[in-house]
């Protein structure tokens, strides 16, 4: 199944992409099978947008072997934060700040895996962790 957030006119909705159509979902996108509406849009008539409205973006560092420089991977993940506007939608331009260009900062294009937590918790067991996710996005 392929889910998306999309803009149709001034409305923002969740939808399921089926072929060349987007079927609108109700607000409960976590369980799409029970939340499809009877409204559909041609994929060419909507704008696909960022999969989330980010508030807090927590990232994990040193998760690429090439970034470790021969050192062993850390035993405990090393989180850091990114600005909310670092998440963009399909086809949006990646804007490199002019200061980074002027200072010849090396940019590192990377594919990212986004895990959207839908259910809170504390001290969650590894075997139960996936049940707390509402969306996995690449």
Regions found by a protein language model. Name each.
Residues 2-136:
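Active-site microenvironments in enzyme catalytic cores
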């Amino acid at each position: 199944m392929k889910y998306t957030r999309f803009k149709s006119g001034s409305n923002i909705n969740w939808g399921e992409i089926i072929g060349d159509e987007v079927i609108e979902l109700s607000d409960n996108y976590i369980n799409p099978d029970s939340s499809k509406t009877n409204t559909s849009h041609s994929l060419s008539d909507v704008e696909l947008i960022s999969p989330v409205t980010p508030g807090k973006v927590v990232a994990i560092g040193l998760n690429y072997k090439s970034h470790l420089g021969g050192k062993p991977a850390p035993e405990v993940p090393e989180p850091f934060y990114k600005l909310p506007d670092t998440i963009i939608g399909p086809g949006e331009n990646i804007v490199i700040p002019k200061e980074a260009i002027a200072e010849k900062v090396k940019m590192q294009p990377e594919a990212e895996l986004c895990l959207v937590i839908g259910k809170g918790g504390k001290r969650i067991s590894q075997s139960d962790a996936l049940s707390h996710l509402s969306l996995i996005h690449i």
